[in-house]
Amino acid sequence: MRFFVLVSAVAFCGAVHAQEFPTRPVRIVTSAVGGTTDLVARLIAQGLTASLGQQVIVDNRPTGIIPGEIVVKAPPDGYTLLFSGSSLWMMPLLQKVPFDPVKDLAPVTLASSTPNIVVVNPAVSATTIKDLIALARAKPGALNYGSGATGASSHLGAELFKYMAGVNIVRIPYKGQGPAVLGLLGGEVQMSFATSASVAAHIKSGKLRALAIGTAKPSALAPGLPTVAESGLPGYQSASNAGMFVPVRTPARLITLLNREIVQALNKQDLKDLLFRDGTEVIGGSSQEFAASIKAEMANLGKVIKAAGIRTE
């Protein structure tokens, strides 16, 4: 009888915990309206609203340190989440920030990955990554590439390529990925590391030539296109990743619950199809896998940032 009472009490406590969250709206703080990060955050919010039975609101803030700063200072109760791209954990390597993304935030899940494709203007003779490396080595500083903001994946992806290949390719900065692609189309620059969504139509029309994709394995986003890694630079990866975080002291049971519900939302086929058309792959792994990927990316790109002396201040 005592055993029955004890088991019943434990079961009751579990049920109470399950009913405790959420009892009010949940907020996802993210960057400015527009772009892939905002899109994924909104799709997750829709899925969570349906599964949790509470409204999940997307709170857009200016891109930069503000979204992270808000969530770091929020109560660790699961009601304030942060959805951010790779720039969040790259920021401390590029500038001084008022918080530590690794120590002050707890990862929930890596939600999505938008890989970069190495594309060249057709005037460039290279048709493969090996050709491109050979061309760059033969003419140091003669080739250039266009990229978006300093520290963006299009910038760091190119610098990683230079670092691993041991070549000198000059950066031509643009205000964003769109202008960089226009510059590539117009012949202002010779190459770029761009998302499939931003260059797919131009590749199909023959206005740009794709050499390889920055994924670890061949991707359905670019059928038939080899990876940079298998084309001469083993271990190379370049993508803009995005995931969900909570304040660091958030209880493990809430992180587990949020992970389960977010991954469930991400695995819906209509959501996957929508993001696929945007050049984005759904990931949705565990919080431990996300933490490991952040650590690996920071270590990998940290060497590049230090060697190139890249700063955003």
Where are these regions (language model features)?
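N-terminal (or domain-start) structured segment
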Residues: 18-104, 142-144, 166-191, 195, ...
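Bacterial N-terminal signal peptides
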Residues: 2-12
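Sec/Tat signal peptide C-region and signal peptidase I cleavage site
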Residues: 12-18
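Short coil/turn segments
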Residues: 33-35, 86, 121-126, 148-152, ...
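An extracytoplasmic/periplasmic, membrane-proximal ligand-sensing/linker region
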Residues: 23-25, 163-164, 204, 230, ...
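A ligand-binding cleft/hinge motif common to bilobed small-molecule-binding domains
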Residues: 87-96, 160-164, 191-225, 302
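Hinge/capping helix and adjacent helix->loop/strand transition within the periplasmic-binding protein
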Residues: 48, 73-79, 93-179, 228, ...
